[in-house]
């Protein structure tokens, strides 16, 4: 990077070796489009290592559940719950133009903040603290000065040998038709509230950014995650939060079963704490417990100033609730990457679930079929007469597309025409699924091709990906 050896103080900490970039917005609203504060799609141009980069961003719709709420407590102990409008939010997912393997998870609220993958390398980006300037810093996590070099670990130590052997990847076919939907409540304890000096807006922004990353990570597992609520214990803890992760997890699960689950519709709850948990532990969750009133929970320590790392820890603990184990040596999520389910939190780019996690998650779902994640959260409680062309997928509809552009379904009913199997996708050809074994995504480098499975229009990820 141009500023090697120099140091700068950013929100994520002191950063050595960074590059100053000036992202330039290059998109314009389509003619006649309604102006939103944050557009549905945006593009930015800047340079990384002298190479021009075009970052394409799409608003992460569905990030918040339909009944999303925020709760805090008054000094006299009263619970105060609001339902803010969050449709026009500023959290995006994206990719780099001309880099098929690229990804991005970006907050565009005040400049660009988040991370993106470019040419196999993961970079962080955030605005520099310079008034009246568009300057941003781009850097790698390895260049953030570490306060604590000790290994940080998940506290789950279950004996995995008690599990039955799982299916081979070739026997497990998961398609978008199997999609599951998980609504999550994030509970912030009083130590977190104190750590952020009682700034609830800052805490919520921190959680929004993490939720954006979590949602992107779970896309690979065909699980759609959304935030059902954020609850901040602003006056005092409602359970005994201890340095023992095990005791805190048990208390939190019991509180959820007797309190939270009766007032907020959700599938899973995670406690975020600034309490320094015993030893190297920074997270703990029950295993294979999704939908259980007491056990569909986890506890995570807010252990890093880098949002991405805390987000991945949350994603890790939630995955335990979904029956996913720690990765072993044979598990892979791409060459050179440390996968999300590593038992040790690695400062490398941890953003992807491994092939093992994919199989274990769906092996658990297929066997146990946890019921709470079957229902797709609707954006309203109203079930209206099915009509095409709106954004809401209403009861009885197969698709929500512009009928004039798609001959595969009936515009009057929004149901597939007789004989049509699909409307679009790499494995859909004139309304019919392509044959099983047809290549739908070519391999990059030493990776493997992805193939159509004959039962979906989408291109499923090859479970044997390197």
Curated annotation (Swiss-Prot):
Enzyme Commission (EC) number: 3.4.24.-
Active site: 317
Primary location group: secreted
Chain positions recorded as Ca(2+) binding sites: 183, 267, 372, 375
One cellular component term from this protein's GO annotations in UniProt: plasma membrane
Subcellular location: Secreted
Cysteine-cysteine disulfides: 291-372, 331-356, 333-339, 422-428, 427-452, 440-459
Signal peptide: 1-6
Record domain Disintegrin: where: 385-466
Tissue: Expressed by the venom gland.
UniProt keyword annotations, A-Z: Calcium, Cell adhesion impairing toxin, Disulfide bond, Hemostasis impairing toxin, Hydrolase, Metal-binding, Metalloprotease, Platelet aggregation inhibiting toxin, Protease, Secreted, Signal, Toxin, Zinc, Zymogen
Binding-site residues for Zn(2+), renumbered to this chain: 316, 320, 326
InterPro entries assigned to the protein according to its UniProt record, in alphabetical order: Disintegrin_dom, Disintegrin_dom_sf, MetalloPept_cat_dom_sf, Peptidase_M12B, Peptidase_M12B_N, Reprolysin_adamalysin
Motif interval(s): Cell attachment site: 444-446
Prosegment residue ranges: 7-174, 377-401
MF (Gene Ontology): metal ion binding; metalloendopeptidase activity; toxin activity
GO biological process: proteolysis
Domain Peptidase M12B: 180-377
UniProt similarity note: Belongs to the venom metalloproteinase (M12B) family. P-II subfamily. P-IIa sub-subfamily.
Identification of the protein by name: Zinc metalloproteinase/disintegrin
Organism: Deinagkistrodon acutus
């Amino acid at each position: 990077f141009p500023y090697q050896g120099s140091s700068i103080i950013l929100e994520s900490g002191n950063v050595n070796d960074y590059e100053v970039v000036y992202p330039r917005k290059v998109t314009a609203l389509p003619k006649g489009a309604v102006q939103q504060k944050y557009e549905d799609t945006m593009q930015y141009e800047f340079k990384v290592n002298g190479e021009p980069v075009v970052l394409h961003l799409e608003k992460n719709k569905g990030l918040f559940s339909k009944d999303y709420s925020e709760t805090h407590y008054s000094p006299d102990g009263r619970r105060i719950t609001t339902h803010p409008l969050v449709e026009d939010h500023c959290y995006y997912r994206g990719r780099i133009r001309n880099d098929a393997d690229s990804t991005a998870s970006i907050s565009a609220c005040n400049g660009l903040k988040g991370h993106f993958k470019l040419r196999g390398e993961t970079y962080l980006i955030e605005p520099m603290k310079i008034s009246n300037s568009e300057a941003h810093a781009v850097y790698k996590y390895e260049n953030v000065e570490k306060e604590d070099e000790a290994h940080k670990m998940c506290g789950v130590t279950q004996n995995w040998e008690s599990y039955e052997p799982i299916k081979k990847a070739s026997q497990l076919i998961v398609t978008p038709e199997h999609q599951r939907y998980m609504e999550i409540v994030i509970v912030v304890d009083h130590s977190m509230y104190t750590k952020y000096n009682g700034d609830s807006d800052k805490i919520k922004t921190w959680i929004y950014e993490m939720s954006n990353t979590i949602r992107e990570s779970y896309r690979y597992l065909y699980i759609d995650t959304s935030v059902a609520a954020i609850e901040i214990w602003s006056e005092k803890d409602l359970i005994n939060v201890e340095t023992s992760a095990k005791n805190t997890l048990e208390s939190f699960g019991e509180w959820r079963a007797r309190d939270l689950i009766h007032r907020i519709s959700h599938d899973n709850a995670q406690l975020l704490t600034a309490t320094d948990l015993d030893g190297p532990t920074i997270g703990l969750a029950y295993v294979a417990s999704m939908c259980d009133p007491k056990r569909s929970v986890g506890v995570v320590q807010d252990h890093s100033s880098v949002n991405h790392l805390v987000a991945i820890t949350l994603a890790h603990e939630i995955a335990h609730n979904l029956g996913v184990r720690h990765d072993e040596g044979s598990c892979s999520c791409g060459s050179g990457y440390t996968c999300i389910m590593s038992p040790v939190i690695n400062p490398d780019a941890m953003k992807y679930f491994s092939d093992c996690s994919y199989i274990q998650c769906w092996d658990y779902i297929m066997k146990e079929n946890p019921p709470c994640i079957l229902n797709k959260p609707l954006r309203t409680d109203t079930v209206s007469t099915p009509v095409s062309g709106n954004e809401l997928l209403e009861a009885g509809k197969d698709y929500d597309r512009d009928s004039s552009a798609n001959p595969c379904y009936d515009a009057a009913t929004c149901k597939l025409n007789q004989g049509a199997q699909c409307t679009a996708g790499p494995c859909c050809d004139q309304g019919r699924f392509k044959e099983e074994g047809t290549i739908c995504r070519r391999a990059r480098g030493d990776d493997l091709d992805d193939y159509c499975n004959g039962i979906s229009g989408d291109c499923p990820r090859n479970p044997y990906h390197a």
